[in-house]
Amino acid sequence: MLCEMPPTTAAAPTTTRDALLDAGVAVADAHGLAGLSVNRVVAAAGVAKGTFYVHFRDRTAFLDALHERFHGQVELAVAAATAGTPPGAERIRRAAEAYLDVCLVNRAVKALALEARSDPSLIASMAARHDRFATAAIPSLRAMGWADAPATAQLVAAMTAEIAIRELDAGRRLPASRRALRRFLAA
């Protein structure tokens, strides 16, 4: 969410894989994590069940792919929002705003990621993505004079994620929360 590196997404996936992922988003939006079954996904995508397993080892791999694709979208948005911005508070602010905006547009995937945080088979990959974003904020925090930049980066990432959760629940931007994050970064 505080990414300051170029996107790391792979080349565009196949059309069928994209259709399955798109169907997964629609199913997640309608039924949440508990209702996200392989059968519902393939029915929504209009493909045979065996096709699912050509692209994904199992449901867990599919959930991980949904989360990875979401983070690819975040990385692209953050890269665009921070292009040409030197390390510092403004760069982190722009990155956080881009992350929050992508979360609002991708409500189903963000909600799914929140539900999946307690899934032991997904915790490691989700934590690695979180850490990648937090780590990317360290140069900006150091430029701002934070001696404890790594710990601060984790806290800023957590605050930004909490704002995303609150906005997800509200179904809209929460300007006061975003202002509070900006004020924290200006400290």
What annotation goes with each model-predicted range?
Residues 19, 28, 56, 63-70, ...:
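Alpha-helical DNA-contacting segments of helix-turn-helix folds
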Residues 13-24, 41, 66-78, 137:
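Generic hydrophobic, amphipathic alpha-helix propensity
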Residues 1-31, 35-44, 61:
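Basic, helix-initiating cap at the start of DNA-binding domains
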Residues 65, 79-105, 153-156:
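Hydrophobic alpha-helical connector segments
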Residues 72-75, 94, 101-105, 119-144, ...:
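Amphipathic alpha-helical packing segments from all-alpha helical-bundle domains
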Residues 1-7, 101, 135-143, 166-187:
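C-terminal peripheral helix-coil segments that are non-catalytic and often amphipathic
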